[in-house]
């Protein structure tokens, strides 16, 4: 039965009789081998339908349909552990493990998580979202079960993009040291989110160029069995040796493949045979991202994720902050040949496609290697260049030691464009940029800015670039507020806030709102409503800088302020409001103050607006918080 190739996303639920009978992998394992092709086809159709209903990650899931069917068919899940790296590709896994009818709720409020989550299912053995963690986690599980004298098979499914991170090789090295019973499935689709880059990608390409896909059907499972005389003697293993000098063998893994990752019959043979072996084993499978859906096969980057097919679209949308960054980057580079740009595998998401085409010799995609990205920039700065690192807030966490030790300690001239700061909606807690103020503002020499709109974002990026030292601009996901962007770039005064509005009332009482970044314009709306309702003067400040704070403005405003309110789209603990509290305490400025921001909890996915409402950071929530605080200040119960 050939693979079906679809050209449209179905709007009606497809007919899937075999899939509908599977609520547990045990029911899958009761089917005949010959029925697995139909299961895979039904699963692919259902993913197309479900993704169209809910949106979400797309191409990666279509690419692992046969692999997922084979894994759950061969291994005794959940007792045997499947550990998915990143989790973009976990939709087929969720569907086969009792969540078929819930899959259309994925990434929605109170729906299924975007990635595997331990609290959601016993089949989700490890919570993921960030890259390159699966082998470490899987090794930990394998060693724990060995220690408990209750061994099981542990299978880590890792993409070729994730294998570019050092953590993956640290884990493989340790697995060999412990002679752990561990299977790593290398899902090689020549992609991460963007195209894979670097020496490892070239190494995999060499295997393909010099070798060939191994066909177990031609020789049978005997070619995966250990030879009685020596460990690595099998024609199957030898095929990899002939294909290229093999990095995995050099580390100490027993290597098998490469296999066709869409041949479910062959994959079943391979996995059943591998269960009879012990020690660290790596199975190399080749898959196609977007498999079975023609548009996604042709353009896997665009179809990495999709929106709902029936999502309403309105008029003209303001530019995304990532696009504002990309335009600034090109403009700044045109004026200064010292500018080099670095991204850890997020060229498209960070808005750098235009720069990469316009300045290819000055563009460095270092793959999924955030630690390396930061120290690479430090080395460039040591030679008198001015590197710009474009990175998501949640991923900069992985380069924190390098930020401190390699950049800030040496006061090197590195600019950080920190994207996806704050809440990120449907991607949930693994991707939230909720902690960057806290982990950066404690670092000496750092300058931290947050723009209120897209024009200020451009000016802040220029300011950070002009600053002689480490400086960061953090901006949110999605579109700006719709203001005109000035082509001319201006260096802002370091550590200087601006008063956005002063709303005067008849009384002498005043509230001062110190707002940061994305919450400035929303806080202005709430403050205007409060002033109208309560006849109280309100001063709204765009703080601009988290570090250095505009301390003088706070001192001056304190003389007339009866209540301070700080507002930020960041964790309250350790955030910008905490910085204001610390300053006021040291200066002995004794004024009532409330801090509005993200609570001390991991926030589950919903739309961005829903999450803001739940946190009280929309205009209504901010207004309610100010009113409650004002009642306390005036001792009105």
UniProtKB/Swiss-Prot annotation:
Q: Name one GO molecular function term.
A: 1-deoxy-D-xylulose-5-phosphate synthase activity
Tell me which cofactor or cofactors this protein depends on.
Mg(2+); thiamine diphosphate
Q: What name is this protein filed under?
A: 1-deoxy-D-xylulose-5-phosphate synthase
What is the top-level taxon of the source organism?
Answer: Bacteria
- Explain the purpose of this protein: Catalyzes the acyloin condensation reaction between C atoms 2 and 3 of pyruvate and glyceraldehyde 3-phosphate to yield 1-deoxy-D-xylulose-5-phosphate (DXP).
* CDD domains membership: TPP_DXS, TPP_PYR_DXS_TK_like
- Residue positions annotated to bind thiamine diphosphate are 88, 129-131, 161-162, 189, 293, 370
Summary of subunit composition and partner proteins: Homodimer.
Q: What class of enzyme is it?
A: transferase
């Amino acid at each position: 039965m050939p693979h079906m190739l679809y050209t449209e996303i179905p709007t009606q639920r497809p007919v899937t009789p075999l899939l509908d009978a599977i609520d547990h992998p045990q029911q899958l394992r009761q089917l005949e081998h010959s029925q697995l092709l139909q299961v895979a086809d039904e699963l692919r159709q259902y993913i197309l339908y479900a993704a169209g209903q809910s949106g979400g990650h797309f191409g990666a899931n279509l690419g692992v349909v046969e692999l997922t069917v084979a894994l759950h068919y061969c291994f005794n899940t959940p007792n045997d552990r499947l550990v998915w790296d990143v989790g973009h590709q976990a939709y087929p896994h969720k569907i086969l493990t009792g969540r078929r009818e819930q899959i259309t709720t994925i990434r929605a409020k109170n729906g299924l998580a975007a990635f595997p989550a331990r609290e959601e299912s016993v089949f989700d053995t490890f919570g993921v979202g960030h890259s390159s963690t699966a082998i470490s986690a899987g090794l930990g599980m394998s060693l724990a079960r060995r220690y408990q004298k209750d061994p099981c098979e542990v299978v880590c499914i890792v993409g070729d993009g994730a294998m570019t991170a050092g953590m993956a090789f640290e884990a493989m090295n340790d697995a060999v040291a412990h002679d752990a019973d561990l299977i790593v499935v290398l899902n090689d689709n020549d992609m991460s989110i963007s195209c894979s880059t670097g020496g490892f990608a070239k190494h995999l390409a060499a295997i393909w160029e010099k070798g060939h896909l191994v066909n177990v059907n031609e020789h049978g499972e005997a070619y995966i069995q250990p030879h009685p005389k020596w460990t690595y003697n099998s024609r199957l293993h030898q095929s990899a040796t002939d294909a290229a000098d093999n990095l995995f063998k050099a580390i100490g893994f027993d290597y098998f493949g490469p296999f066709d990752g869409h041949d479910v019959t062959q994959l079943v043979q391979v996995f059943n045979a591998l269960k009879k072996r012990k020690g660290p084993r790596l199975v190399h499978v080749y898959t196609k991202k977007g498999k079975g859906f023609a548009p996604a096969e042709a353009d896997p980057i665009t179809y990495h994720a999709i929106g709902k097919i029936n999502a309403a679209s309105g008029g003209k949308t303001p530019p995304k902050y990532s696009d504002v960054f990309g335009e600034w980057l090109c403009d700044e580079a045109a004026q200064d040949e010292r500018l080099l740009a670095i991204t850890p595998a997020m060229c498209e998401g960070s808005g750098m496609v235009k720069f990469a085409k316009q300045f290819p010799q000055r563009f460095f995609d270092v793959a999924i290697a955030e630690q390396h990205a930061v120290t690479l920039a430090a080395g460039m700065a040591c030679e008198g260049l001015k590197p710009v690192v474009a990175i998501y807030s949640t991923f900069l966490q992985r380069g924190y030691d390098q930020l401190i030790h390699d950049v800030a300690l040496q006061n090197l001239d590195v600019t950080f464009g920190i994207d996806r700061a704050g809440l990120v909606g449907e991607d949930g807690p693994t991707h939230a940029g909720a902690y960057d103020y806290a982990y950066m503002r404690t670092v000496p020499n750092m300058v931290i800015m947050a723009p209120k709109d897209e024009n200020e974002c451009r000016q802040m990026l220029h300011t950070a670039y002009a600053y002689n030292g480490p400086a960061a601009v953090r901006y949110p996901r999605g579109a700006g507020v719709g203001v005109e962007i000035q082509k001319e770039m201006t260096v802002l005064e370091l550590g200087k806030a601006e008063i956005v509005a002063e709303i005067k009332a008849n009384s002498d009482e005043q509230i001062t709102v110190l707002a940061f970044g994305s919450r400035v314009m929303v806080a202005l709306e709430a403050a205007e409503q409060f002033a109208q309702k309560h006849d109280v003067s309100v001063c709204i400040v765009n703080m601009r800088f988290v570090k250095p704070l505009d301390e003088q403005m706070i001192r001056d405003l304190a003389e007339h302020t009866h209540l301070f309110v700080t507002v930020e789209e960041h964790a309250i603990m350790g955030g910008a409001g905490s910085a204001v509290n610390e300053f006021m305490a040291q200066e002995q400025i004794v004024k009532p103050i409330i801090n509005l921001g993200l609570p001390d909890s991991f926030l589950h996915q919903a739309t961005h607006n829903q999450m803001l409402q739940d946190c009280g950071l929309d205009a209504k929530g901010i207004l309610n918080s100010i009113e409650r605080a004002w009642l306390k200040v005036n001792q009105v119960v």
